């Protein structure tokens, strides 16, 4: 099974920041704006892809001051996260509007995966 997530803002892919400076820059871009978290999954068996799934969540971030951003980063240290936030921790409080699955936002659309596994009697 393979899973990956891509954060997209204004037709730009926002990579995992890796450090505080890039994290601040990303959050400043997203502040007050709408972006998308895209989650893709695939299952392969015997050298064949037997299932794929793709889901998108739409998120609108609150307006954040530099102090807000620095306070948030000090709590969650989201340096290895698409979009520079950990939605499952304090990141969820950064948003004014969210459309889509929290699992897609977190990078694993578990709902779609479980439906597939149940329908095919893997679980």
Regions picked out by a protein language model, each given a short descriptive name:
Residues 1-123:
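Anionic-ligand binding patches
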């Amino acid at each position: 099974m393979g899973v990956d997530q891509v954060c997209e803002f204004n037709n730009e892919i926002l990579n995992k920041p890796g450090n505080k400076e890039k994290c601040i820059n990303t959050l400043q871009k997203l502040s007050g704006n709408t972006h998308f978290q895209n989650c893709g999954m695939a299952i392969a068996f015997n050298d064949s892809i037997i299932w794929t799934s793709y889901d998108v969540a739409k998120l609108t971030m609150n307006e954040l001051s530099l102090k807000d951003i620095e306070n948030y980063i000090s709590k969650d240290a989201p340096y290895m996260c698409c979009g520079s936030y950990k939605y499952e921790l304090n990141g969820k409080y950064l948003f004014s509007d969210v459309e889509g699955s929290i699992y897609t936002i977190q990078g694993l659309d578990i709902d779609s995966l479980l439906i597939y596994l149940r329908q095919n009697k893997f679980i």
